Regions:
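Pyridoxal 5′-phosphate
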Residues: 1-134
Length: 134
């Protein structure tokens, strides 16, 4: 039997991507990523993984926080602020281990449906959570 749900889903995804302006999407992601990057820049112990320029990271921001367990931080962000992030190795265990980042990272991702307000909310809650846990 064919994988009809997968075929229909792929067709819907292609239609969706054809309707959006990818350059506009990229500009939006970078703009939101800059808000996050700037918002966490002054927090003691926070280190950005990857290029400093948000344009080189598109919609992804990965962070380590000295003295904080990223899994605990993710739970606090969710429970205290309704902010959903990922924590851990993000399917690249070897990359983290080769750099001795044994705790993994906290990762945010933004997309077309995210807003500047949501990104500012993240940076506020993130700052509070880091201060509470470190």
């Amino acid at each position: 039997l064919g994988h009809y749900a997968g075929i229909a889903g792929t067709g819907a995804a292609i239609e969706y991507l054809n309707r959006i302006d990818l350059a506009e999407l990229q500009e939006h992601e970078v703009s939101l990523n800059r808000i996050i990057t700037d918002g966490v820049a002054g927090i003691s112990g926070v280190e950005l993984i990857g290029p400093a320029d948000a344009a080189a990271r598109a919609g992804i921001t990965a962070l380590t926080v000295e003295g904080c367990d990223v899994h605990d931080l993710a739970i606090v962000l969710d429970e205290a602020g309704g902010v959903m992030v990922r924590s851990g190795y993000h399917c690249v265990n070897g990359w983290f281990q080769a750099r001795n980042l044994m705790a993994g990272s906290l990762r945010t991702s933004v997309y077309l449906y995210n807003t500047e307000e949501e990104c500012r909310h993240f940076t506020d809650i993130f700052s509070d959570a880091v201060n509470a846990l470190s």
